[in-house]
Amino acid sequence: GIGGKPVQTAFVDNDGIYD
């Protein structure tokens, strides 16, 4: 979730949602 965008990927980034 770069910039907080909830993009569904195989990983969870620092946003705590998706990459």
Swiss-Prot record:
Post-translational modification: Glycosylated.
GO biological process terms on file: defense response to Gram-negative bacterium; killing of cells of another organism; neuronal ion channel clustering
UniProt entry keywords in alphabetical sequence: Antibiotic, Antimicrobial, Cytolysis, Glycoprotein
Cited function: Has antibacterial activity. It inhibits fish bacterial pathogens, A.hydrophila and M.luteus, and also E.coli, P.fluorescens and S.aureus. Forms large ion channels responsible for disrupting the cellular envelope of bacteria leading to cell lysis.
Protein name: 27 kDa antibacterial protein
Origin species: Cyprinus carpio
